[in-house]
């Protein structure tokens, strides 16, 4: 595993450490994983229009962090948009979190950004499959 700079040059080699068992109930983990899968594949999923037809099963969750600001210079700014997930579903090799400040809704703004990361990482040509755009969180 490695980290690249913004010009795709190797910045440093990363050595992953084994995850520590935190004692979560395996059934609870399974329920969360199924929910993340539904969010990206079920007809009612908030990012299913982005990830549902992607050739590698990606799972994740959209979000919109609401902002309450009373300062005059900050009025009118939009909510923060985010999407976090991983793939492939059955054997994850990449985790992506996209946070777009003042972006609006996660399913509309952040999920497409995350999709581009998955496309690049897995070498998937965007023209090789069809993806619709979702419009809700």
Predicted regions, residues:
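Active-site beta-strand/loop architecture of penicillin-binding DD-peptidases
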Residues: 1-20, 27, 36-128
